[in-house]
Amino acid sequence: MAKEKYDRSKPHVNIGTIGHVDHGKTTLTAAITTVLARRLPSSVNQPKDYASIDAAPEERERGITINTAHVEYETEKRHYAHIDAPGHADYVKNMITGAAQMDGAILVVASTDGPMPQTREHILLSRQVGVKHLIVFMNKVDLVDDEELLELVEMEIRDLLSEYDFPGDDLPVIQGSALKALEGDSKYEDIVMELMNTVDEYIPEPERDTDKPLLLPVEDVFSITGRGTVASGRIDRGIVKVNDEIEIVGIKEETQKAVVTGVEMFRKQLDEGLAGDNVGVLLRGVQRDEIERGQVIAKPGSINPHTKFKGEVYILTKEEGGRHTPFFNNYRPQFYFRTTDVTGSIELPAGTEMVMPGDNVTIDVELIHPIAVEQGTTFSIREGGRTVGSGMVTEIEA
């Protein structure tokens, strides 16, 4: 069969498998790639076996060691990048650091066990970090003879999802066996195809970065005599055009307005800069000393400066280059947002005395000056220039 050309016209979606250890996440990932390769052969759909996915390479993301397997496959409608992490700690790190930005996820629950502690933790993390769409795959149904037991497990999963504000009564639950599908049992292969059909239908197409409101973290500022002030950086999301009205947000109490009079990339004038571009933006009505690294240039009204927020954080182990000792309430490290460090104090949840290296925890943070943040903004926690933790803003408080 001739190799097909990679089809870029298909929408691209990022998904992953989550759930308790040994419930079958990696087996399901292998089954999806294998069944799609059999049913929809293409250059993208290549079977991956359990061992190759399980031997996920170590990656360094913001100083943290994470093992993650990335596989790709396609359905008739979409192209998918799928993330599977071997260990529980890898999931926690992946989700909290934003290394794995999932548009949706497949929650794998073994029908023989029902929901377990990590099932709950992964659902909570999904809620915290903004994975809005979950599909349940009840695995290992071939090992359960009792139909009533399967119904009970399904009810238990739905209740648990509702507890964490997911639409537990309405979201799709598919019952199957990843191992049987992998082994070529056509009944269970059909179920994997049904699962992928459900993923196609239920997980909405993500908004493209260029459709989102402009956000450009300022890295450098200089003035050009006779022309004005230039701020440069990599556009995080959105588009910036000549004559756009923008806001300069963060560090200072007041948000400032300005107009873009030029956009440059590699010393060439552009009409517009897009998400991912490194640009210099010429601003009218802004003095050189009124804008600084650590601020962001944004679409007016799209993001505000804040000093207080809740965050979900992972604290590095000693082996990862983190702290050797725990920290306590009112710990005051630096919080590194995009391009700059800001000191802040940490309040631990009631009943938590201290946080050990390797822990993940929800914290309240108060920064000494405001930063442009929103739900989903990621940050590093640093001490004297070295990273000791990583986190994500889950809720704005002030």
From Swiss-Prot:
Residues that bind Mg(2+): T26
Domain tr-type G span(s) in chain numbering: 10-207
Subcellular location(s) per record: Cytoplasm
Region (G4): 139-142
Single GO cellular component term: cytoplasm
Region of interest (G1), ranges: 19-26
CDD domains tied to this protein: EF_Tu, EFTU_II, EFTU_III
Region annotated G2, chain positions: 63-67
Pfam family of the protein (one): GTP_EFTU_D2
EC number, UniProt record: 3.6.5.3
Binding-site residues for GTP, renumbered to this chain: 19-26, 84-88, 139-142
Main subcellular localisation: cytoplasm
Disulfide bonds: none
Region of interest: G5: 177-179
InterPro entries: EF-Tu_GTP-bd (IPR041709), EF-Tu_GTPase (IPR050055), EFTu-like_2 (IPR004161), EFTU_2 (IPR033720), G_TR_CS (IPR031157), P-loop_NTPase (IPR027417), Small_GTP-bd (IPR005225), T_Tr_GTP-bd_dom (IPR000795)
Region (G3): 84-87
Keywords on record: Cytoplasm, Elongation factor, GTP-binding, Hydrolase, Magnesium, Metal-binding, Nucleotide-binding, Protein biosynthesis
PROSITE patterns documented for this protein: G_TR_1, G_TR_2
Alphabetical list of SUPFAM superfamilies matching this protein: EF-Tu/eEF-1alpha/eIF2-gamma C-terminal domain, P-loop containing nucleoside triphosphate hydrolases, Translation proteins
Cited function: GTP hydrolase that promotes the GTP-dependent binding of aminoacyl-tRNA to the A-site of ribosomes during protein biosynthesis.
UniProt-listed HAMAP family: EF_Tu_B
Family that this chain belongs to: Belongs to the TRAFAC class translation factor GTPase superfamily. Classic translation factor GTPase family. EF-Tu/EF-1A subfamily.
Protein name, entry field: Elongation factor Tu
Lineage per the UniProt record: Bacteria, Bacillati, Bacillota, Bacilli, Lactobacillales
